[in-house]
Design a protein with these regions (language model features):
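Charged, low-complexity intrinsically disordered terminal segments
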Residues: 1-90, 96-315
Length: 315
């Protein structure tokens, strides 16, 4: 598989980099995230670029979870404007009627021709660009095609099987299809921590269940997740208190900026690094609700070192 070096793009730098890629695109643009909010200067520039690309014949598709309708009265008007400009807008997820947090699509994939962003948690919104977060940028037709294949496979009102597919010589894309109680990503996280000599853990939420037990017994160099202090809404504050309190004594994060990155780096007995990074928060709550997720399992040593440096900067 031919691929260039993977680039870690911080959330703050993503709008400008993605905008350049969108403006250069000649064939396809795929923008997928759980949350889509159109307000803000960076988002306005990105949406204008999407419309301009559609006008020059590029196939442009925006895919997001219906959760985006929450607290955003103008979204119907924005969607109609995008559709009139030639941008296809689709809604994904497989929610259960009457239970709004179930069956959500938490996937983040951005693709412009053969450049694709994976393995991070950045939503398609102005507020998301201010979080501690990132995306991994690949420049490879093979990686882009396989990532979009995964996106199409997950695009269903019904839960899909979990699966894994190699996207490069060092990287494998893992996908949770949304079956309640089942997560190939969480299983892989447990396997990494169980066999690790040292561990670096960063997430929006504390680990739970078996992963939490394994992490307590591991040599954890960095453990960083949010507290109620970093909450940007009442719902966030309640969620952090409810999901993080049992593991709070192990938390090393003292900052005020929201952590939205989600990854684990595990040092093996031979000193090599294996990393797992993506949209999964490593908390079993989303698994019980049947959330669709994607993550990258990578043996790239340079990327592993970048992720360790990122974790150290948080504490």
């Amino acid at each position: 598989m031919n691929t260039t070096a993977t680039q870690l793009v911080p959330a703050a730098a993503l709008p400008k980099q993605l905008l350049r890629d969108m403006r250069a695109a000649q064939h396809r643009i795929w923008l997928q995230a759980m949350e889509f909010h159109s307000e803000g200067p960076a988002m306005q520039a990105l949406l204008e670029a999407a419309c301009a690309a559609a006008a020059r014949g590029v196939k442009v598709r925006l895919v997001c979870d219906p959760h985006s309708y929450a607290n955003q009265p103008s979204i119907g008007r924005v969607v109609r404007q995008l559709q009139r400009a030639g941008v296809a807008v689709d809604w994904c997820g497989h929610g259960w009627w009457g239970w709004p947090v179930a069956g959500r699509s938490h996937v983040k994939i951005y693709c412009c021709d053969d450049t694709v962003y994976l393995g991070g948690g950045v939503n398609f919104s102005q507020a998301s660009f201010a979080n501690h977060d990132f995306m991994l940028r690949y420049r490879s037709a093979e990686v882009a095609n396989r990532a979009l294949g995964a996106a199409h496979n997950l695009y269903s009102w019904w839960a899909r099987p979990d699966y894994a597919v190699a996207v490069s010589a060092t990287d494998t894309l893992l996908a949770d299809g949304g079956t309640r109680g089942q997560s190939i990503i969480l299983e892989q996280a447990c396997a990494l921590v169980r066999n690790a000599k040292r561990v670096w853990y960063v997430s929006q939420f504390a680990p739970s269940g078996r992963l939490a037990s394994l992490l307590r017994r591991s040599q954890a160099e960095v453990v960083a997740f949010n507290t109620a202090r970093t909450a940007t809404s009442l719902l966030d504050a309640v969620g952090y208190r409810a999901l993080n309190y049992r593991f709070q004594a192990h938390n090393q994060y003292l900052g005020d900026r929201k952590i939205h990155a989600k990854y684990i780096v595990a040092e093996q007995a031979d000193g090599r690094l294996v990393s797992l990074t993506g949209s999964h928060n490593f908390n079993a709550t989303g698994v019980r609700f049947g959330t669709q997720e994607t993550a990258i399992l990578t043996h790239d040593q340079s990327l592993g070192q970048q992720l360790i440096s990122y974790a150290r900067q948080l504490v």
